[in-house]
Amino acid sequence: MVEMSTGTTNLVRTLDSMDFLKMDRRTFMKAVSALGATAFLGTYQTEIVNALEFAETKVIWIHGSECTGCSESVLNGGNPDIVQALTKLNVNLAYHETLCMQQGIWNDGELVNTSELNSEILLEDLYKEGNYILVVEGSIPNGPDGSGRYLVIGNKTFKETLGEAAKNANAIVAVGACACWGGITSADSDIEKDTDYRGVAFKKTDASKGMLKELGIDKPVINIPGCPCHPDWVLLTLGAVILGKIKIPDDLPAALDQYGRPKVFFPPDHTVHENCPRRGYYDRGEFDTEVGGEKCLWKLGCKAPYAHADCGIRRWNGSVSMCTQAGGPCINCVDPGFPDASRPLYVEAEDKGIVGANIDTIAKVAVGAAAVAAGVHAVRRMGKGE
């Protein structure tokens, strides 16, 4: 554990010498509390911007079965934005199916022309060269019957594409719930067994059914879940890998949780609920029963007490809002069981309570809860030297 001074100048100096993906939760919370989320991220943005020249890092970003929402989220990032990240880190985004012009020229079943005009040849050349970071967005169908032919791109199944891309990758990052563990496409249904959609390293919570395992490829994967994922989670993770802040595979056991998620963004022992902007209403036992209110959203199906992510600290849309702040109950889209574990999305989970207590009991002891909350906030203020 790293002890830190609460003085801002000393804190910034301390942060400059730290690897943020290796911070424990206490250190991370102290840093964010002292600097604020925007300033905290800005500290690392400055580190990136002022870094020495790097050798070019190639990134190959491939898409399976998905809605491209995670790419859109990353493109909307602002601290740093995608252009800053690519430019300052000297990243060559060699392939991205949404951003690159797609062409496939075939003649009698054979690829023809050059990599400049044929994206299929470009990918094959990149795979052979190796030395790249592979980003995977979207799930991978294994069906029907293990063939993977429910998703074919350029006369090749995406299952084959993933296998070819993963073999020579220096690092593999799964972006979004679908790539991490199947997501929406692997939701329980009458056809799920036939389609058999999987994540790169997991199928829901089962690591034995990840697609790399199916392909016989033994490589670690960094999972950045969410539906969509937060742009900071993606860009800061890629930045940490490129800058050498996290060594693969040596540092991964300490930096990642049991599902391959960076602990600094997805803390195992803390939840979205703890830093929810509506938390005060929960402490007082005040709950909305209809949409459009301003109180706690638990009775409208909010899953924040079970969602392990830093949304309440980081916020979205330029660090100004988040789902619950905007009036939408958290659906715990970062969980390996999503979406099935979150269903029904907008109905109170009557068989569950928050921290082991029935929610109606919480309401009956609202005065006591408020007192406890006041004490917690007082301790936090003392910890910041206020």
From Swiss-Prot:
Induction: Expressed in methanol-grown cells. It catalyses: methanophenazine + H2 = dihydromethanophenazine. Keywords: 3Fe-4S, 4Fe-4S, Cell membrane, Iron, Iron-sulfur, Membrane, Metal-binding, Methanogenesis, Oxidoreductase, Signal. Its cofactor is [4Fe-4S] cluster; [3Fe-4S] cluster. Predicted to be exported by the Tat system. The position of the signal peptide cleavage has not been experimentally proven. InterPro entries: Cytochrome-c3_hydrogenase_C, NADH_UbQ_OxRdtase-like_20kDa, NiFe-Hase_small_C_sf, NiFe_Hase_small_N_sf, NiFe_hydrogenase_ssu, TAT_signal, TAT_signal_bac_arc. It is a peripheral membrane protein. The keyword S-adenosyl-L-methionine does not apply. PROSITE patterns: TAT. One of its GO terms (cellular component) is [Ni-Fe] hydrogenase complex. Residues 1-51 form the signal peptide. Pfam families: NiFe_hyd_SSU_C, Oxidored_q6. GO terms for molecular function: 3 iron, 4 sulfur cluster binding; 4 iron, 4 sulfur cluster binding; electron transfer activity; ferredoxin hydrogenase activity; metal ion binding. Its EC number is 1.12.98.3. [3Fe-4S] cluster binds at C311, C330, C333. PANTHER family: HYDROGENASE-2 SMALL CHAIN (PTHR30013:SF7), NIFE / NIFESE HYDROGENASE SMALL SUBUNIT FAMILY MEMBER (PTHR30013). Composed of a large subunit (VhoA), a small subunit (VhoG) and a cytochrome subunit (VhoC). Part of the F420 non-reducing hydrogenase I complex that catalyzes the reduction of methanophenazine to dihydromethanophenazine. This is F420 non-reducing hydrogenase I small subunit. It comes from Methanosarcina mazei (strain ATCC BAA-159 / DSM 3647 / Goe1 / Go1 / JCM 11833 / OCM 88).
